């Protein structure tokens, strides 16, 4: 908790870093079938949960895609998650009504990893993270459509506002999941606040499909320091992904330097190589904006491989705040 508060209070720690030499920058690529293609968080700020799902799957050899939605909502139930939500609603985004209509989005990779290892994981096929199934009342029954998650949350909030008037006979639409039909959805809506609705939804949907991890380990968080790349390389060399907390503006502007709290983003580091052109060790960032390299807004100077981008140590260091990793057990 102390490190997380420090991260919020001091997002920029300006020290010169120790660059990795060419000799110590041997090629590493940890992408495999377990990770699969880069996923797309769309308009939901659950980057830390998508990265966490990758880290857990890769570390524990889970071949089935994990639900990032499950990880994110699990994070929101922790003390840190509750505090960050309060901070968002009361200090950072109190003038934005949309914030109150959705499951809380901002979070910390370390906290979500610890909660997920404690709670177990739910498959993406059971609790999707990109779109949800909407059932709209029609003349001859229910009409089924897929709705992007951000829009689904806004529509669920609208129902929550009138929850006392709703029954299975008059609800205009609901969202269908395993273990949750129209009746169950109406019952879940009766929660006093929207965050409790999502907590109970997650538990109901995943109750028959939650898997425990084979073992639980430690989660390390290291704040930016001059020898941070030594720590990163050690983890990559041991076959471990590294979660990177940094300013997302560097993805769209290669000249960006510095960190704004409102621009904090989390991605995974999945590879390393030496660039003779840049005379620098480069790292492969596995982002969560999908596989499209052309229309995702990335700086055109970057080499992009299906949503994975190569950045130099200098670019990473001057825009980062910390790393998180699961040390080998």
Stretches with model-predicted labels:
Residues 34-63, 68-79:
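Cross-family signature of deubiquitinases and ubiquitin-like deconjugating cysteine proteases
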Residues 28-39, 89-98, 206-217:
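Acidic/histidine-rich, surface-exposed loop or edge segments in extracytoplasmic proteins
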Residues 46-49, 70-73, 81-82, 112-114, ...:
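Structural recognition of the beta-strand scaffold that forms the well-ordered cores
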Residues 3-13:
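Sec-dependent N-terminal signal peptides
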Residues 18-21, 36, 160-329:
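Active-site signature of cysteine proteases
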Residues 14-34:
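Non-catalytic, low-structured ubiquitin/UBL-interacting segments
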Residues 65-179:
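Papain-like cysteine protease catalytic cores
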Residues 41-57, 101-114, 265:
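Active-site nucleophilic cysteine motif
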């Amino acid at each position: 908790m102390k490190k997380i508060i420090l991260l919020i209070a001091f997002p920029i720690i300006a020290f010169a870093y120790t660059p990795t030499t060419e000799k110590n920058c041997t090629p590493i690529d940890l992408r495999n079938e377990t990770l699969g293609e880069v996923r797309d968080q769309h308009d939901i700020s659950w980057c830390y949960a998508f990265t966490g799902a990758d880290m857990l799957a890769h570390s524990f050899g889970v071949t089935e895609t994990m639900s990032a939605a499950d990880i994110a909502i699990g994070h929101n139930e922790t003390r840190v998650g509750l505090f960050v939500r309060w901070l968002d609603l009361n200090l950072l985004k109190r003038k934005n009504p949309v914030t109150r209509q959705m499951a809380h989005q901002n979070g910390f990779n370390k906290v979500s990893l610890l909660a997920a290892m404690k709670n177990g994981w739910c498959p993406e096929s059971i609790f999707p993270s990109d779109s949800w199934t909407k059932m709209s009342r029609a003349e001859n029954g229910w009409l089924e459509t897929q709705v992007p998650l951000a829009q689904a949350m806004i529509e669920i909030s609208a129902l929550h506002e009138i929850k006392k008037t709703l029954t299975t006979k008059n609800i205009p639409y609901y969202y269908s999941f395993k273990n949750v039909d129209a009746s169950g959805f109406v019952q879940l809506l009766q929660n006093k606040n929207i965050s409790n609705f999502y907590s109970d939804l997650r538990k109901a949907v995943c109750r028959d499909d939650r898997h425990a991890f084979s073992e639980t380990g430690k989660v390390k968080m290291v704040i930016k320091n001059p020898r941070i790349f030594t720590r990163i390389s050690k983890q990559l060399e041991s076959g471990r992904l590294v979660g990177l907390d940094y300013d997302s503006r560097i993805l769209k502007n290669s000249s960006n330097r510095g960190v704004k709290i409102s621009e904090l983003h989390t991605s995974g580091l999945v590879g390393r190589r030496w660039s003779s052109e840049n005379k620098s060790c480069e790292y492969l960032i596995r982002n969560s904006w999908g596989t499209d390299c052309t229309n995702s807004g990335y700086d055109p100077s970057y080499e992009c491989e299906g949503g994975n981008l190569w950045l130099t140590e200098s670019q990473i260091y001057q825009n980062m705040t910390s790393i998180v990793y699961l040390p080998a057990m």
